[in-house]
């Protein structure tokens, strides 16, 4: 509170869900900078409209927390990569992307689930190569499929940077099993490994396609040459 007892909020939060598309966006950033307070957009930013001017404005601001964008569909990957090259040239701060998945899954559509998981990992692969974090956002439809728990396991790995940056998805799954064996008397297969094995059995004919993505590691995938000139 100030000297008159009035509540003074330490941060400014903004709820506009598409503020980047506003023509006077850089003016808004300048006004926020002028307040002297850290600020944060509470919705994911739309990187598709990012340009040099917007990237510079955001990178010089007192932003609170991680910058968060959205990478919802694989078909956007060329555009997202072009914008990432701009963004990474100007911003050194941690950058995270929401990764939407699981939409319109039904209980018997195995092909759709495989393609959805495969292209989810292709998006993660791009983010890793640019030194960015992913955050898996599951639509409730993922629960319709008998293999829906694979999304839960992916989210448990991807949404926690200490795992995402240090181990592959496959290593994370195996670590769950070893942790259970080390800390309990149970001899059962843990839920994570059981889900992984069921996924592999179901898609054995496609396993060679997705296995390298499950074994992909952040530290071996990040490539500064993608954005450094």
Show the residue positions of the predicted features.
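Auxiliary Fe-S-binding modules of radical SAM enzymes
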Residues: 103-229
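Anion (oxyanion) recognition and catalysis
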Residues: 33, 88, 125-129
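Core AdoMet radical
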Residues: 1-83, 93-101, 133-137
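Extended, compositionally biased non-globular segments
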Residues: 89-90, 115
């Amino acid at each position: 509170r100030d000297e008159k007892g009035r509540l003074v909020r330490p941060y400014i939060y903004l709820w506009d869900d598409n503020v980047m598309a506003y023509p006077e966006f850089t003016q808004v950033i300048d006004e926020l900078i002028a307040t002297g307070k850290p600020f944060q957009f509470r919705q994911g930013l739309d990187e598709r409209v990012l340009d040099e001017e917007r990237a510079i404005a955001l990178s010089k601001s007192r932003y609170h927390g991680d910058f968060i964008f959205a990478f919802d569909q694989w078909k956007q990957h060329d555009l997202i990569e072009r914008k990432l090259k701009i963004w990474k040239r100007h911003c050194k701060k941690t950058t995270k992307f929401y990764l939407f998945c699981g939409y319109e899954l039904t209980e018997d559509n195995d092909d759709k689930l495989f393609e959805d998981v495969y292209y989810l990992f292709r998006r993660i692969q791009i983010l890793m190569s640019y030194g960015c974090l992913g955050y898996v956002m599951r639509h409730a439809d993922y629960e319709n499929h008998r293999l829906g728990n694979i999304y839960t396991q992916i989210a448990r790995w991807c949404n926690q940077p200490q795992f995402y940056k240090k181990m592959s998805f496959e290593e994370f799954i195996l670590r769950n099993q070893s942790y259970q064996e080390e800390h309990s008397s149970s001899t059962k297969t843990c839920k994570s490994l059981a889900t992984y094995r069921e996924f592999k059995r179901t898609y054995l004919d496609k396993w060679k396609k997705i296995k390298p993505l499950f074994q992909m590691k952040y530290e071996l995938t990040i490539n500064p040459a993608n954005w450094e000139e």
